[in-house]
Amino acid sequence: MKVMVIQGPNINMLGVRETHIYGNMKMEDIHEQMKQAAKQANVEIEFFQSNFEGELVDKIQECLGSVDGVIINAAAYAHTSIAIRDAITAINMPVIEVHISNTYRREEFRQKSMIAPVCAGSVVGFGPFGYHMALMGLFQIFDQINAYKAAQAKAQQANQ
């Protein structure tokens, strides 16, 4: 299995930007922790960060056929981007949305996610640990998909 982690605008500034909201952990530290968790589960993991909406859309589209699931922190674009929402819909695979801060305790414009309705789930407000939670969520989804495929194969064999 392979997972792509897509980071949106200003995530590269973690540990520097608004530490009272986002904490002191840098993006690279989050990625390192995720690499370790993925390695223990024998799952490949890749990372991508961009401050540009079109580059995020391109990366989401590139996931089709190359990864099994996506973790995305679209950051501010989660609240505004129909293009990112449409790209997530188009790839038809498990996508989990992450927000480091609890967006529901923040400004009103941050309280609605355009992408949440097309994601398998959202992890909001758990700080950097939210990425680990999202990864565990994808592992659970992968297990369910594999169990379903095994049951289908068994049913097909029984019908032959």
Curated annotation (Swiss-Prot):
EC number(s) recorded for this UniProt protein: 4.2.1.10
Catalyzed reactions per annotation: 3-dehydroquinate = 3-dehydroshikimate + H2O
Active site: 22 (proton acceptor), 99 (proton donor)
InterPro entries assigned: DHquinase_II, DHquinase_II_CS, DHquinase_II_sf
Keyword Lyase part of the UniProt annotation: yes
Site (Transition state stabilizer): 17
GO molecular function, one term: 3-dehydroquinate dehydratase activity
Family: Belongs to the type-II 3-dehydroquinase family.
SUBUNIT field: Homododecamer.
Protein name (Swiss-Prot/TrEMBL): 3-dehydroquinate dehydratase
Organism whose genome encodes this protein: Campylobacter lari (strain RM2100 / D67 / ATCC BAA-1060)
Origin organism lineage: Bacteria, Pseudomonadati, Campylobacterota, Epsilonproteobacteria, Campylobacterales
Gene this protein is translated from: aroQ
